[in-house]
Each structure stands twice: as structure tokens, then as C-alpha cells.
Amino acid sequence: MDTITRQDRITLKNLKVADFASEETLCFTATVMFDGRPIAEARNDGHGGSTFVRALQGQAALLAQAEEFVKSLPPASLDVEREDDEPLLIDMTLDFLVDQLADAMHAERKLRTAFNRDIGNKVLFIKDGRLLFLKGIKLKAIADRAAYFAKLRSRQDQPIVILAELPADEAFAIWKQHVLGDKPR
């Protein structure tokens, strides 16, 4: 999951997004975690306003610690067009970080959904550095995948990588790299 700011102490759990209600900003609710402990509930109504972060009962001190931690992070540099070619820097706040995390988690979920749809319905493979699939062949309909994949390999003049044979996370990373045009990290 990519965000503008790299840190691992503050995360979100139980993210619920209402795409239909998202207008200017992402409409969501989530539990804010600090060092693995739930400390607050966050919500944004999706109308362009702020994200509200409210401490859970008895967690106000931890919420204050989390806010101090976020203030210690370097400012976020946004990629926006400016006349002076200077990067736009925004001081980190907890609500801004929560927005980043929610956006990144939601985008990752949507990507995972598209991947799961593709990997379940298509025979996806990498050949010559390109992501390809067999038209009209549904992966779910192949009874003996090992034999089918062996035959597919024998018909190729170059080695191929069949995504269905890889562990799910590895297949997702390769698929994502090709679909989004990302370079491997």
C-alpha cells in the first residue's frame, strides 16, 4: 500500500467506504490503530470537509501520543503543478495521515478486486515482459491445470510465467506492476 508518508505505527482497521456518498473526499469510517492498539474512530462525510478523529473511551492519552508522533514526521510533498517549481509541502497531521491511509487502503482493495476477477476468469501469463491472457479460456473451467499449463508452455518459443501457478501475493504484485505500469521495488 503506497502513501505519501512512509511509517508503520499508525494504521487503519475496519475501513468502510461509501463510494456512492464520496463527492469531494472519500466518505469513510475506520478505527485508528497506534502501535497495534485501537485508539480512535475516524470518519469523513465525503463532502470535502475534514476527517474527524475521536478518541475511543480511555484512549485520549494514546491519541495525543499518536498526534505528537505524526507531527514528528517530515512534511508531505505533493505532486501538483506550481508556477515556481517548488514542491508543495504540507505539515503532517493525524487527520491528513488518516486520509492518506484510507485512500491507499481503498485503492488497494479496488485493485485486489480487479485482480481477483482477472485471475479467476483468465489464464494470465507474462511473455516478453508483457501481461497476456488467452481469449475465450476461463481458468475456472480448466480441470487439469498442470497438464494445460505444460501444453501452453510447450507451444511458446520463449519461457512464460503463468500467474495462476504463483502464490497469490506474488501473482498480485506482478499483475499490479504490469497493469499500473509500476516498476518493481
Region annotations inferred by a language model:
Residues 1-34, 38-185:
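Terminal leader/tail segments of proteins
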